[in-house]
Amino acid sequence: MKLSRRSFMKANAVAAAAAAAGLSVPGVARAVVGQQEAIKWDKAPCRFCGTGCGVLVGTQQGRVVACQGDPDAPVNRGLNCIKGYFLPKIMYGKDRLTQPLLRMKNGKYDKEGEFTPITWDQAFDVMEEKFKTALKEKGPESIGMFGSGQWTIWEGYAASKLFKAGFRSNNIDPNARHCMASAVVGFMRTFGMDEPMGCYDDIEQADAFVLWGANMAEMHPILWSRITNRRLSNQNVTVAVLSTYQHRSFELADNGIIFTPQSDLVILNYIANYIIQNNAINQDFFSKHVNLRKGATDIGYGLRPTHPLEKAAKNPGSDASEPMSFEDYKAFVAEYTLEKTAEMTGVPKDQLEQLAQLYADPNKKVISYWTMGFNQHTRGVWANNLVYNLHLLTGKISQPGCGPFSLTGQPSACGTAREVGTFAHRLPADMVVTNEKHRDICEKKWNIPSDTIPAKIGLHAVAQDRALKDGKLNVYWTMCTNNMQAGPNINEERMPGWRDPRNFIIVSDPYPTVSALAADLILPTAMWVEKEGAYGNAERRTQFWRQQVQAPGEAKSDLWQLVQFSRRFKTEEVWPEELLAKKPELRGKTLYEVLYATPEVSKYPVSELAEDQLNDESRELGFYLQKGLFEEYAWFGRGHGHDLAPFDDYHKARGLRWPVVNGKETQWRYSEGNDPYVKAGEGYKFYGKPDGKAVIFALPFEPAAEAPDEEYDLWLSTGRVLEHWHTGSMTRRVPELHRAFPEAVLFIHPLDAKARDLRRGDKVKVVSRRGEVISIVETRGRNRPPQGLVYMPFFDAAQLVNKLTLDATDPLSKETDFKKCAVKLEKV
C-alpha cells in the first residue's frame, strides 16, 4: 500500500487517537503502523531544560528520525513543549563539527592562524604540551575547566576527578554557576542540604502558586501546563506572578505583580511581617523545627576588589550570621510595613495584601516557584533564604501541595553540577574542598594519596574570566557550554583573556559557537543520544538513557575526551614527590589508570551490555565505564540522605527521586512518613543541620550594583524565549524554531519608544558602560516591560547582549546578576 504524506499523517493520527481511546484501529492505520516498525524506539530525558520530560526517541538507519512525548513518563505524561518535538533536528545542523580544528599558520599552531583540520592525536599532542608546560612553570592554579549543567552525571564526575584529584586544581566550575549557584547556597544556609524537598506531584495538590521571577509559561511550559490544568479545573486555586515586566505567565495570574528591580527583597520581608502581625505563625512547627539568625549586611557585589563598590563595602563577601531572638526578628521585619513596601516596590497595596494573605492563610497550601529572577541577583542567596522564611514561619513545607521549589534551567544542573559537585568548592554529595574530612573521604575512596585534593577553593566562573585576562590562568578547557555568549561583560572581562597570546583555549562542542570561534582548539563533540547518559532534574529525579546512534565523523563524547586525555599524564608529572612517597605503588601510572581504569571502576564487564547495544566508550576500553563511574560516585551519597539506586534500576525506570532507600524513591523530604531519614515521632527533621532545625534569616533590602541614572536611564533585563534555549546553539539550527523567532528584539514600553522617536521594527543601538549592540524595537508581543525597563533575550549570536551586562555577582554564590544593569538607547 502506498500512501501520500497527507494520508500517512492522517492515518497515523487516527491510529494514535484510537490507541489512546482503547478503540479498534482502522486497517489503513494498521498499515501505517506496519511501515513504522522499522523505526526503533527507546526512552530518554529531553536534552533541554531542567524539567526532565521523558521522550521516546525513534532511530532508523543510524539516525534519530523522530521524537515524541513518553506517555509513561511521570513528569510530562506524553506531552512535549515546542522544543521537545524538534529534538532530532538539533543533532543534524549543516555546520555540525566532525573533526578537531586547530588555529594554524605554516603548518604549526598559531594564535592568529586559521582553523585547520587535525587528528585527535594531534589535538591531544598540543593540549598535552600546553597543560604540562603550564603545570611545570606555574603550577595547578594556571589551568582551568569550565563545564556544564548539560554534562551527563559521569562526564561531570570524570571531569571533577581529573582536575581535583589528577591535576590537583580546583579551577573547575560549571555554567550552572550562572543559574543555580544562589539556590545551592540558599539551600545550604537554610537547610544544610541542597535541592528541593518537594516534587512535581505537589502541583495537583496545591491551593496557590506564587511565581517569583519565573516565566514558567515559556521556560518550564510542561510544568506550566500542569499548573494551568490545576488552576482552571478548580475555582479555589490561586496563581500569583511577580516579575519586573509582564510576560506570558501573567495570562493565568489572579494577582499579577510588577515590581521595581531588586525590591523583591522588600516584598519578602513585608510578607514575613504580615504573617507575624496577623498571628499566622505555625507555633508548633516554628518552636520545634526553626532557629533564627541575623546575617551580615553590606557584603559588596562580587566585583574586582579595586571597584569602588567593593572598596565601600563593610563586609565584602561575608556569609557570617549570629543567633537572634524572635523579638529581635519581629522588630527587624516590622520595618517593612505595607506603606513602605508599596512605596519602594511600586506595587499597589491591595495586591501586596492579597499576596501576603496566601501565605498567612493556614488553610492554603502554597508552592513558591522561582528561577533566574531570584538566582541571577546580587542578593540571590538572600532572596532564596527569605522565601524559605515564609514557609518556615507558616509550616508550609515538606508536605504534599506546599513548599518552596527552586526550578532549574539545565537538564542536569542538579544531577551533575550540584550533586556530583563540579563547582570549584564542592565534592560529591554536598561535600566541600575546604573540609579536611570531606577531602579525606574522597581521597580514600579514590585510592589517591592524602592531601592530593587542594583545600583552597578554585576559581569560579567570573573569576576564571578575570584570571585569564590577568594572565594567571593560561590553559582553559570548556565543555558543553557557550560562555563567550552566555557570560557577562564580554568586552571587558572575557574576550581579552581568550585572545591573550599567553593563554590557550580549548572548546569542546558539537557546533561552531561564538565560544568555539574565539578558541584556539575546537574538539567535535557527541551529543545527547549519541552517547549513554544520565541527568538529574529539578525534583531530584535521576534519569538514564542508552546510546542510540553514533556521532558523525570523528565527534567524541565529553567522557571519551576526558578519559583518553588522562592517558597523556603520569603521576610523577602532576604530583609532587611528597604525595608519591605516600603511595609509591602509583609511580609510573597514568592518570587514566589511577582515576578511571581502577579495579573498582573497571569491574563491570562489557558483557553486561546487550550484544547490539551501542556504547562507544565502554567497547573501546573493554569495561562498562559509565556503570563503574556511577557506582563509585553513588557510594558517596548512600546512607547520607543522597541515596541513589543501583545503576541498572535506572535503565528500567522512568527516573527515580532520591533518596532512594530499599528501592523506594522519596517525594517529600524532611517529614515523617515521607522521608526514610525522619524517624517516627520526629515530625520534621532538617537533618542537613546538626540539630535538625532549619534557619530563618534576617536579611535586609540592599540596592542593585547598577541602576539607571540621567545618562543610562533604563533598566536592562536579559533572559530567554520559548522557542530558543540559552544561546541558541542547538535551537537556532532547527529551521522551524529559527523561523518562529529568527532574531532577538528589544522589548520596550510604547511610551519609552515614543519618547526616543522609536517605532516598532526600528533598529536601535543599546548602549551600556561596557559595550553596545544593535537590536530591533518591539513594542508589542509576549513581553510587556513597564516604563523604565527594557528586556532582551540572549539567544542571538548576532546580538551579543552580554556585551552590555555587568559582571556583578552575588558575593556568597558568585552568581551573576543578568537581570539588572543600566542602558541608554540611540536610534540607528
Swiss-Prot record:
Name this polypeptide is given: Periplasmic nitrate reductase
Post-translational modification: Predicted to be exported by the Tat system. The position of the signal peptide cleavage has not been experimentally proven.
Family to which the UniProt record says this protein belongs: Belongs to the prokaryotic molybdopterin-containing oxidoreductase family. NasA/NapA/NarB subfamily.
EC number(s) given by UniProt: 1.9.6.1
Subcellular location: Periplasm
Residue ranges occupied by any 4Fe-4S Mo/W bis-MGD-type domain in the UniProt entry: 39-95
N-terminal signal peptide: 1-31
Catalyzed reactions per annotation: 2 Fe(II)-[cytochrome] + nitrate + 2 H(+) = 2 Fe(III)-[cytochrome] + nitrite + H2O
UniProt organism field: Escherichia coli O139:H28 (strain E24377A / ETEC)
Keyword line: 4Fe-4S, Electron transport, Iron, Iron-sulfur, Metal-binding, Molybdenum, Nitrate assimilation, Oxidoreductase, Periplasm, Signal, Transport
Residues binding [4Fe-4S] cluster, per UniProt: 46, 49, 53, 81
Cofactor: [4Fe-4S] cluster; Mo-bis(molybdopterin guanine dinucleotide)
Name of the encoding gene: napA
Physiological role: Catalytic subunit of the periplasmic nitrate reductase complex NapAB. Receives electrons from NapB and catalyzes the reduction of nitrate to nitrite.
GO annotation terms (biological process): cellular respiration; Mo-molybdopterin cofactor biosynthetic process; nitrate assimilation
Cofactor binding notes: Binds 1 [4Fe-4S] cluster.
Assembly and interaction partners: Component of the periplasmic nitrate reductase NapAB complex composed of NapA and NapB.
PROSITE patterns from the UniProt entry: 4FE4S_MOW_BIS_MGD (PS51669), MOLYBDOPTERIN_PROK_1 (PS00551), TAT (PS51318)
Binding residue positions for substrate: 794
